[in-house]
Amino acid sequence: MASEMKYFLDQTTSLWLNGALHGKPACVFTSSGSMHGGQESTLLTMLPPLFHHGMMILGLNNAIPALSHTKTGGTPYGASHVSGPRHDQSLSQDEKVLCEAQGKRLGEVVKKLQA
């Protein structure tokens, strides 16, 4: 995980002590310069702090066709993007579909929890 994200999460101790995020839904996403650039391990290292907060972790559903046939980013742990070695690649269509699906799922869960 990026040091900036780690620093941000390290600042949430007061939220943890108060249980402020317990039961709240969360998801993670990332990007890397290459297809084997550590996307899955990055997503997985972002999850433990969320578990410690008692958050509900949401991933991507394997029934989403784009997850099965993407040639760029995307894992069951969360949406991802392969930016290329020069970090100049735009999101692929599959990546866009997966990002939208993840955001939609997060929104749907939030609505159900608020009902």
Say what each PLM segment does.
Residues 59-115:
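Glycine-rich phosphate/pyrophosphate-binding loop and the adjoining helix
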